[in-house]
Amino acid sequence: MRYATLSWNCHNAYVDAAVTSDPESGKFVKSSPLWHGVSPAGTQLIAEMNRMGMLVDLAHVSVDTMRDVLAGNETMGFGGSEAPPIFSHSSVYSICPHPRNVPDEILHLVKERGSLVMINFSPDFISCEPSDDGTGIPRFVEKNNTLAQVVRHIMYVGELIGYDHVGIGTDYDGIESTPTGLEDVSKFPNLVAELLRHGVSDEDAGKVVGRNLLRVWGEVDRVAERLQRTMLPTEDNIKLGGFELDGYRGHLEL
């Protein structure tokens, strides 16, 4: 196993998720914090992932979790991930204000850590506007569900923090619909052509379509090699703090 996402659409014993399921309606809602980021067990998990050479994936986690993993949490005595994490399928909050997307304050931490945001093609995460329905989940906007909007997300990250820190994370295997013009991987040349048409250099386009991920993966391997020389594997059971699973929703036995 070479990478793992720290959560899905539910809190767990290790981290807070961005979105959870409302127990009454069954609808997804913006989450309320459980751990306020990474739990004590989560710090152990991330340390062992670093030692093993596993990519730490921040797609699906809350902003507090993003911040803890990228910048550490001094109160907990947690220095964050020693290797750069990735967002394997997330987009830009400033363009589409979905809790799953990455806000600007976190994008700046992505740059500091040499990390990577891979833009998700899910229509709900690329084309949306604020909603007043009380869920914290924005309203989908059909007219912007296009290849051009995906390019807008990519270029936003590239222009804000540099093209070393943006990639493509389609989520084709996890979504039911796609942006117009990006129905499948055969449309990738059109995406690259649109980036070039907007003035993105050949070199930067190459980073976006793969070289950035290879760079991050190389750094993850280098960190693992260093840690394995001085750090023993975590073989004890990680204490979960009374956390148990209840379907897709976790709860604490207090």
Model-derived regions, located:
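Aromatic-lined glycan-binding groove of carbohydrate-active enzymes
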Residues: 100-137
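Short acidic/histidine-rich active-site segments
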Residues: 120-121, 160-185
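Histidine/acidic residue-rich metal-binding segments in metalloenzymes
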Residues: 19-86, 99-114, 148-164
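Active-site beta-loop-alpha junctions enriched in small/polar residues
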Residues: 7-11, 54, 59-66, 90-93, ...
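Histidine/acidic-residue-rich, glycine-tolerant segments that coordinate divalent metal ions
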Residues: 8-24
